[in-house]
Amino acid sequence: MHRHEVREHAEVRHLSHFNSLFTGWGSRVYDVVMVRLTRRLYQRVIADLAALRLVEGKVLDAGTGPGTLVRELARRLPGLQVYGIDLSEDMIGIARAHARREQLEERVQFESGDVGHLPYPDQSFDVVVSTISMHHWYELEQPLRELYRVLRPGGRLWIYDFRFVKAQTLEKAKALTPFAETTLKHRLVRTGRSPFALYRCFALQKTAQRDHQQD
């Protein structure tokens, strides 16, 4: 089997795995079960964002799922405009339904899309966060390029994922992107005693200077 055929086969398997977890019945189960298991992590993310003391600005949640974090941020940090994107149209449908029911439609925006091809202009966001999503990404280089592109100069990227996600994996991908000249910081985040209580947070910051064009 040629290399491109191996890659295509891997992409098909990855898409099949994604569809089984995050579409149809799977999306509804995720909305009920995983959101409860990760609630304390979301509280930690909100606290981290609050510590920045942003009076106003835009925040993107990449891999937002049913939009729980986006809605919580809108309630807790009313000066921010909060956006969420997810590859699953079913998840985005759930997120929008929750926002309507909670009367948050004017405070939040949800889009269906790929983190590797974000539908936002350059330098759109002050902060991009991603929770329990990166380990599902088929590859890391293109998503990192896109996340860099949509960050404003000085903007921050925070990726929270399970403890088993290693910094070396992200470092290797980072070296191939405009983030290459920035330092990857990472730390363990404890949110309780449950099996879903220990996470790893990866932090990158875009340079404050205006960037020259990079391919």
Where are the model-predicted features located?
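N-terminal, positively charged/glycine-rich alpha-helical extensions of SAM-dependent methyltransferases
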Residues: 1-28
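Conserved alpha-helix/loop element of class I SAM-dependent methyltransferases that forms part
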Residues: 38-56
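Conserved SAM-binding strand-loop segment of SAM-dependent methyltransferases
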Residues: 103-116
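A short acidic, Gly/Pro-enriched loop at the edge of an enzyme's catalytic core
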Residues: 116-127
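A short glycine-rich, Lys/Arg-flanked "PGG" loop and its adjoining helix->strand segment in the class I
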Residues: 141-153
